[in-house]
From Swiss-Prot:
Belongs to the V-ATPase V0D/AC39 subunit family. It is found in: Cell membrane. One of its GO terms (cellular component) is proton-transporting V-type ATPase, V0 domain. GO terms for molecular function: ATP binding; proton-transporting ATP synthase activity, rotational mechanism; proton-transporting ATPase activity, rotational mechanism. PANTHER family: V-TYPE ATP SYNTHASE SUBUNIT C. It is a peripheral membrane protein. One of its GO terms (biological process) is proton motive force-driven plasma membrane ATP synthesis. It comes from Thermococcus onnurineus (strain NA1). This is A-type ATP synthase subunit C. Keywords: ATP synthesis, Cell membrane, Hydrogen ion transport, Ion transport, Membrane, Transport. Component of the A-type ATP synthase that produces ATP from ADP in the presence of a proton gradient across the membrane. InterPro entries: ATPase_csu/dsu_sf (IPR036079), ATPase_V0-cplx_csu (IPR014272), ATPase_V0-cplx_csu/dsu (IPR002843), V-ATPase_V0D/AC39_subunit (IPR050873), V-type_ATPase_csu/dsu (IPR035067), V-type_ATPase_csu/dsu_dom_3 (IPR044911). Has multiple subunits with at least A(3), B(3), C, D, E, F, H, I and proteolipid K(x). It holds the Pfam family vATP-synt_AC39.
């Protein structure tokens, strides 16, 4: 073979190799670099999350004034600055605003290709607020007491809380995805529980569709997160229904599609104990076994265990995919837990509960 031909082949081969290397390098840069700054910032924020020792110190506050003062060296300081009367309601609102600020920060600092997911996560608070307001209205309770100041449609939610009639709420919801389900509720075509399920079904469908539209690591992480949340919702719905002696046909409309576990066999068991036994063979078996005895007396124990399982799973994914969307998801879950615990401490202090008992109760609430 002539020297020129050999040189040509070598040049072509080198060009192909360098093109491939360049492509792979560009893919790595595109995939990981956008997470470098936000994840470093989130890790720094994670280091500031309150320790168990700090929660115990807060439990010793005895007054809400002291509780607020004790948080002045934390990221809650600016949100608590508006507290003047030191009521538990004021403090809860401030903590809710702090949590909302965390969601908003994620939307701001994360790559554009994933930050819409965090906007969608805020819609869960819309669903919670809408259902809470309507439940309160139906039993003639002050609906504004149940509004959490987080979500994408807070002004509408507050208007709903102030509405004089149930029909007025329909006008407020006009043009939103919630208009049609609410109209069915007003007409008596669906029950309040079915209305709530429909809103969650719509919410999780949005999340899952978004997750499935992603590729590679982002799809793996987002899909796992959404399906875990759906599983948690379905398991708790099913067990509460079994505790209430509901039949399979009554429960089916309350199940949200998109979870990882098959529920058909569990739907047809006779009671809560048998349902727990059926769940033992699923991926959640170990979680349930750890709290089995307590669960039969108090289902909130399982809710906390499932929340903990989801947090642990996101932490695992954070270690496996350090420069990924797993880090902000893990942080959001930890922040939600922190705010729940702070709200619980504030409420217990307001109720005059002794510090040692507060520590026990808040530790259980983790």
């Amino acid at each position: 073979m002539e020297t020129g031909a050999v040189t040509g082949i070598l040049n072509t081969t080198l060009a192909v190799v360098f093109t491939w290397v360049g492509y792979k390098t560009a893919r790595i840069v595109w995939k990981y670099t956008p997470y470098s700054y936000p994840n470093a910032r989130i890790k720094a924020m994670e280091a500031k999350l309150l320790s168990e020792q700090r929660f115990n110190e807060l439990a010793e506050s005895r007054t809400l004034n002291n509780f607020v003062v004790s948080l002045e060296d934390t990221d809650y300081k600016d949100y608590l600055a508006s507290v003047s009367n030191y009521t538990v309601e004021e403090i809860e609102r401030a903590l809710e605003r702090a949590l909302a600020g965390t969601y908003e920060l994620m939307v701001t600092i994360l790559p554009k290709r994933v930050n819409p997911f965090f906007r969608l996560l805020l819609e869960e608070w819309d669903v919670r607020n809408i259902t809470s307001v309507i439940k309160a209205k139906m039993v003639n309770e002050p609906a504004s007491d149940y509004v959490v100041e987080i979500g994408t449609m807070l002004p509408k939610v507050k208007a709903m809380a102030e509405a004089k009639t149930m029909e007025e709420i329909l006008v407020i919801l006009e043009g939103t995805p919630y208009e049609e389900p609410y109209q069915k509720l007003l007409l008596g075509e669906i029950s309040l529980k079915e209305f709530e399920t429909e809103l969650y079904r719509m919410y999780y469908a949005k999340l899952l569709n978004y997750a499935l539209s992603k590729k590679e690591d982002e799809r793996v992480i987002l899909e796992e997160f959404v399906r875990l949340k759906i599983d948690k919702t379905n398991i708790l719905t099913l067990l509460r229904a079994k505790a209430a002696k509901m039949g399979a046909e009554e429960i089916k409309p309350l199940i949200i599609p998109g979870g990882t576990i098959k529920l058909d066999s569990i739907l047809h068991v006779d009671d809560l104990s048998m349902a727990l036994a059926e769940l033992d063979s699923t991926r959640y078996g170990a979680v349930i076994r750890d709290v089995r005895e307590e669960v039969e007396r108090d289902l909130s124990v399982l809710e906390r265990a499932l929340d903990r399982h989801i947090r642990e799973r996101m932490n695992e994914l954070t270690r496996f995919y350090p420069l990924s969307v797993a880090t902000p998801l893990s942080y959001i879950l930890q922040k939600e837990r922190e705010v729940r615990k702070l709200r619980a401490i504030a409420k217990l202090i307001d109720d005059g509960v002794e510090p040692e008992r507060i520590k026990e109760l808040v530790g259980d609430a983790a």
